[in-house]
Curated annotation (Swiss-Prot):
Main location, first listed in the record: membrane
Family per record: Belongs to the ATPase C chain family.
Subunit structure: F-type ATPases have 2 components, F(1) - the catalytic core - and F(0) - the membrane proton channel. F(1) has five subunits: alpha(3), beta(3), gamma(1), delta(1), epsilon(1). F(0) has three main subunits: a(1), b(2) and c(10-14). The alpha and beta chains form an alternating ring which encloses part of the gamma chain. F(1) is attached to F(0) by a central stalk formed by the gamma and epsilon chains, while a peripheral stalk is formed by the delta and b chains.
Intracellular or extracellular location(s): Cell membrane
Encoding gene, per UniProt annotation: atpE
Site annotation Reversibly protonated during proton transport: residues: 58
Assigned keywords, A-Z: ATP synthesis, Cell membrane, CF(0), Hydrogen ion transport, Ion transport, Lipid-binding, Membrane, Transmembrane, Transmembrane helix, Transport
Example of a GO cellular component annotation carried by this entry: proton-transporting two-sector ATPase complex, proton-transporting domain
Protein name in the entry: ATP synthase subunit c
């Protein structure tokens, strides 16, 4: 295989990181809704923690995207 095809295979594999981020964010918010339904008085604290967790999880997907773009255009 030449380097160009290996770059595109690596870029395709980076999609796994973006898929993982999407699953992580959906899991965080489904757990948030479930937790708020059980204990509405803890809504403010739960929302803060969920947004921090979602931001960190989404950062993984963005890093994966940046690495994929670096692989394609380098």
């Amino acid at each position: 295989m030449d380097m160009v095809s290996l770059k595109f295979i690596g870029t395709g594999l980076m999609a796994i990181g973006m898929y993982g981020a999407a699953l992580g964010v959906s899991n965080i918010f489904s757990s948030l809704l479930s937790s708020i339904a059980r204990n509405p008085s803890a809504t403010e604290n739960l929302q803060r923690m969920a947004l921090i967790g979602a931001g960190l999880t989404e950062a993984m997907g963005l890093f994966s995207f940046v690495i994929a773009m670096l692989l394609i255009f380098s």
